[in-house]
Amino acid sequence: MSGPNPNKEPVDLNRTSLFWGLLLIFVLAVLFSSYFFN
């Protein structure tokens, strides 16, 4: 009975997708700022 809780997986997946979304926005912001300041 020590298996992963099925109700926990969608939350982890949502948190991971949110983390990658924020990381992608951060990288795009850095690229755009370096492009505009050059």
UniProtKB/Swiss-Prot annotation:
- Asked if Nucleus is a keyword of the record, the answer is no
Membrane topology annotation: Single-pass membrane protein
Transmembrane residue ranges? 17-37
Q: Which Pfam families match?
A: PsbL
InterPro entries, alphabetized = PSII_PsbL, PSII_PsbL_sf
For this UniProt record, the keywords arranged alphabetically read as follows: Chloroplast, Membrane, Photosynthesis, Photosystem II, Plastid, Reaction center, Thylakoid, Transmembrane, Transmembrane helix
GO cellular component, alphabetical, reads: chloroplast thylakoid membrane; photosystem II reaction center
Assign the protein's first listed, main location to one coarse class: plastid
What are the subcellular locations of this protein?
Plastid, Chloroplast thylakoid membrane
List GO BP terms, alphabetically. Answer: photosynthesis
**Entry keyword annotation includes Ligase:** no
HAMAP family reported for this sequence: PSII_PsbL
Q: Which family does it belong to?
A: Belongs to the PsbL family.
Function, please?
A: One of the components of the core complex of photosystem II (PSII). PSII is a light-driven water:plastoquinone oxidoreductase that uses light energy to abstract electrons from H(2)O, generating O(2) and a proton gradient subsequently used for ATP formation. It consists of a core antenna complex that captures photons, and an electron transfer chain that converts photonic excitation into a charge separation. This subunit is found at the monomer-monomer interface and is required for correct PSII assembly and/or dimerization.
Q: How does it assemble?
A: PSII is composed of 1 copy each of membrane proteins PsbA, PsbB, PsbC, PsbD, PsbE, PsbF, PsbH, PsbI, PsbJ, PsbK, PsbL, PsbM, PsbT, PsbX, PsbY, PsbZ, Psb30/Ycf12, at least 3 peripheral proteins of the oxygen-evolving complex and a large number of cofactors. It forms dimeric complexes.
Q: What is this protein called?
A: Photosystem II reaction center protein L
- In the UniProt record, the gene name given for this protein reads psbL
